[in-house]
Amino acid sequence: MACLFVASCSNDIIDKKEYPNWKATNEAFFSKTLSQAKTSISKGDKAWKIFRNWTLPGLDTNYKVADNEQVVVKVLKSGSETQHPLSTDSVLVAYRARLLPSTTYPNGWAFMQTYIGGYNAKTNGSIILPVVGTIISNKNTRVALPEGYSTAIQQMVVGDRWEVYVPANLGFASSAIASIGIPEYSTIIYDITLLEINPKKSIR
């Protein structure tokens, strides 16, 4: 099992030429994706889901959750299990985390991934990650996993493959961005397949 952290070759990763109008581009993209998901869900489309930040307290029905406190999910494959991971668990996943398209990366820079090239369930690598906790960055420092990742993974079951859209607010904390090498204000797009749940074996 291996997780690949793809490091930038230079400081160009934060160059405005690489990521022009990055804040506005990312905010507009997530807003459009959220709107699309809401429209699809209202029409009965089961391929789209929206989840509020798991760290928010219990809310009454009159509370309006801010757009940037939600993650959007597009279901690529549904598993048949019923158990969901808890915040204290760890999980075995195959995944890729990428940014929106930029000047050099037309498909978005994949800055964390367990496989190279196209998705292949038979050959993909995998890694054990905490549901809530930290990981080692490509600069060998510990960084907290995004709340958006933790929010989505707790809603999955084994066999699910989801594309998860995480707004910058629920992405990596400002203190972690430099360690990972991604620019601020980045929407993160995860392709996650949940392979196994390890109850109460959280990796911190």
Features from the language model and the residues they span:
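Sec-dependent bacterial lipoprotein signal peptides
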Residues: 1-10
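Cross-family detector of peptidyl-prolyl cis-trans isomerase
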Residues: 9-204
